[in-house]
């Protein structure tokens, strides 16, 4: 078999496509065509990932909002319970005072 060249889309030995070569644009001078190609690839990747990221952000925001509302609601509930318990305690004190008054008055 002939060895795979630069234009060969598949590696004939392993049947795999070649990976893109990683470059550092700050060290290597790139042509405008290469820069344009890089921007197009980045834009395509960003547009491909954007809907999934947006969905995750919405779900995360709704989850955090639900947690905040739950804490807020529980705070109101616990404060109303404390007020209710304070009223019961006041009634119990009044009942004890009446009982003491009856006991001392008899």
From Swiss-Prot:
Q: Give the keywords, sorted.
A: Acetylation, Coiled coil, Membrane, Mitochondrion, Mitochondrion inner membrane, Primary mitochondrial disease, Transmembrane, Transmembrane helix
Listed under GO biological process in this entry are: mitochondrial cytochrome c oxidase assembly; positive regulation of mitochondrial translation
Task: Give the recorded effect for residue 72 to C.
Answer: In MC4DN14; uncertain significance
The answer to whether UniProt assigns keyword Transmembrane helix to this entry is: yes
Where does the record place the region Disordered? 1-34
For this UniProt entry, what is the primary localization, expressed as one broad class?
mitochondrion
Q: Which GO terms describe its cellular component?
A: mitochondrial inner membrane; mitochondrion
Which ranges does the record list as Mitochondrial intermembrane topological domains? 79-106
Q: Which Pfam families match?
A: Coa3_cc
The membrane-topology field of this record reads: Single-pass membrane protein
Task: Enumerate the transmembrane spans.
Answer: 58-78
Mitochondrial matrix topological domain ranges are 2-57
Give the modified residues of type N-acetylalanine: 2
Residue ranges of coiled coil = 78-104
Record carries keyword Transmembrane helix: yes
> Which cell locations does it reside in?
Mitochondrion inner membrane
Annotated disorder = Mitochondrial complex IV deficiency, nuclear type 14: An autosomal recessive mitochondrial disorder with onset in early childhood. MC4DN14 is characterized by developmental delay, cognitive impairment, motor delay, abnormal gait, sensorimotor demyelinating polyneuropathy, exercise intolerance, obesity, and short stature. Serum lactate levels are marginally increased. Patient tissues show decreased levels and activity of mitochondrial respiratory complex IV.
Question: What is this protein for, i.e. what is its function?
Answer: Core component of the MITRAC (mitochondrial translation regulation assembly intermediate of cytochrome c oxidase complex) complex, that regulates cytochrome c oxidase assembly. MITRAC complexes regulate both translation of mitochondrial encoded components and assembly of nuclear-encoded components imported in mitochondrion. Required for efficient translation of MT-CO1 and mitochondrial respiratory chain complex IV assembly.
Query: Belongs to which family?
Result: Belongs to the COA3 family.
Subunit info here reads: Along with COX14, core component of the MITRAC (mitochondrial translation regulation assembly intermediate of cytochrome c oxidase complex) complex. Interacts with MT-CO1/COX1, SMIM20, SURF1 and TIMM21.
Listed name of the protein: Cytochrome c oxidase assembly factor 3 homolog, mitochondrial
Organismal lineage: Eukaryota, Metazoa, Chordata, Craniata, Vertebrata
């Amino acid at each position: 078999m002939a060895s795979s060249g630069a234009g060969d889309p598949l590696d004939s030995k392993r049947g795999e496509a070649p990976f893109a070569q990683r470059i550092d644009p700050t060290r290597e001078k790139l042509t405008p065509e290469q820069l344009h190609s890089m921007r197009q690839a980045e834009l395509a990747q960003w547009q491909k990932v954007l809907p999934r990221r947006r969905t995750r952000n919405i779900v995360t925001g709704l989850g955090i909002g639900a947690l905040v509302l739950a804490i807020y609601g529980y705070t109101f509930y616990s404060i109303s319970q404390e007020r209710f318990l304070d009223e019961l305690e006041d009634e119990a004190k009044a009942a004890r005072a009446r009982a003491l008054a009856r006991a001392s008055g008899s």
